[in-house]
Amino acid sequence: MRINVESLSSIKKKINFEIPSERVASEVEKAYGEIRKHAAIKGFRKGKVPKDLLVKHFSDKMADDVLKNIINDTYFKALMDENIYPVSHPVIESDELKVGESFKYSATVEIFPDVVVKDYTGLEVKKEKYVFNEEVIANRLKEMQENMSHLEPADAQHSAMNGDFVTFDFKGFVGGEPFDGGAAEDYQLELGSGRFIPGFEDQIVGMKVGDEGEIKVTFPENYGQKDLAGKEATFAVTIKEIKVKELPELNDDFAKDFGEFESLDQLKAKISEVYALQENERIETELRERLIKALIDKNNFEVPETLIDKQLNLMLENSKKRLAMQRLTMEMMGLNDEGYKIQFRSVAETQVKGSLLLEALARQESIQVADDDLDAKIKEIAAQNNQELETVNNFYQQNAQAKENLTAQLKEDKVVDFLLAKAKIDEVDRSEI
């Protein structure tokens, strides 16, 4: 057998094979021998069918079996002999199989790029300065007030406004005819929530209990019910009740309702502390992302499409899971699988490049994850999730893949810490990034 390896690019190799005619003949005889054991031809017992009839009826199956046997035997041996580590399935191209002649085929595969990281000290990156934002604290207190609010019936002369909860009956018509799902009684709607057709809530504003009115709207072109999309509609509405939201007063008693606080100042201090923690985590995450991007800019290289596709599929599945937790779907976000992959392909490529660079740098600088590092991380995970340390530790001991993933993440974190220690970091306002 003769083998020749072509480097088509830094990430793609083509292995050319030539199988001697003697080997081909041997495999053909072997294949017909196996076929004869099971061949059923009228007038002959199994195992007794003459070869000329086998050739006549089973030549295609013979060729398939021979190709499979030859390729399985020679392809994997060549990978080992030539030290080729593919990241993709092979693309096989072959000549027609002919008895008495040598057989040629090729296998094209993608391989990991040979990454040697350079210019990784002194990377220049910008870090956002943490700035305390009083408005964020006020907004959080407002949210807490909203969560502690209760509804009270409005007086008879109250005109509905955004934020009110209005109960009403409605009947909808398109072209003068009622439509499915276009009518309801005692329907409650928070004005300004945007839950209804655009323009509907705006026309409820200003109405009072007992008012009857006619509301005209146009269904959006992308409305879920295709038979209504883009059509004008008229709704007859009757206002039955208006409730206004009563917010608790912001004082020490309000703070005490949350259990651990004795005063409003203590509550504000806690909100500030949590906000600072979240903001600094965000700033640190974005700094690390910019650092990796700077490393990629200094060390650009080709990435196998297979690795990008794998990362894209992982990102897609994670996105679907996050949306499902919010009872949402990709379609609700205006995306399908293909559209998502087109939109986020460059992101996936950057993530793959970053991972390969960090892995290569870990080898170059002999950065390893010690048992103490892993133990400390497992303790951190247990504390964050309020779980027993033994439970979390057992999970990782019994799940090799989860432990491997955690170790890989820890190694990446250590490499990024190494880079940060040698980087030139410029703290700037957010507007300068």
UniProtKB/Swiss-Prot annotation:
Cite the EC number: 5.2.1.8
Q: Which UniProt keywords apply?
A: Cell cycle, Cell division, Chaperone, Cytoplasm, Isomerase, Rotamase
According to the UniProt entry, its GO molecular function terms are: peptidyl-prolyl cis-trans isomerase activity; protein folding chaperone; ribosome binding
Question: Which residues does the UniProt record annotate as the domain PPIase FKBP-type?
Answer: 163-248
Q: Which domain of life is it from?
A: Bacteria
Q: Which GO terms describe its biological process?
A: 'de novo' cotranslational protein folding; cell division; chaperone-mediated protein folding; protein transport; protein unfolding
The record's section on Pfam families has:
FKBP_C, Trigger_C, Trigger_N
Name one cellular component (GO) term: cytoplasm
| Localisation | Cytoplasm
Q: Which SUPFAM superfamilies match?
A: FKBP-like, Triger factor/SurA peptide-binding domain-like, Trigger factor ribosome-binding domain
- Kindly indicate whether the keyword Cell division belongs to this entry: yes
Q: Which reaction does it catalyse?
A: [protein]-peptidylproline (omega=180) = [protein]-peptidylproline (omega=0)
Query: What is the role of this chain?
Result: Involved in protein export. Acts as a chaperone by maintaining the newly synthesized protein in an open conformation. Functions as a peptidyl-prolyl cis-trans isomerase.
User: In which family does this protein belong, per the annotation?
Assistant: Belongs to the FKBP-type PPIase family. Tig subfamily.
Domains as described in the record: Consists of 3 domains; the N-terminus binds the ribosome, the middle domain has PPIase activity, while the C-terminus has intrinsic chaperone activity on its own.
Supply the HAMAP family for this chain: Trigger_factor_Tig
Name the record gives this protein: Trigger factor
Could you read off the lineage of the organism from its UniProt record? Bacteria, Pseudomonadati, Thermodesulfobacteriota, Desulfuromonadia, Geobacterales
Gene behind this chain?
Answer: tig
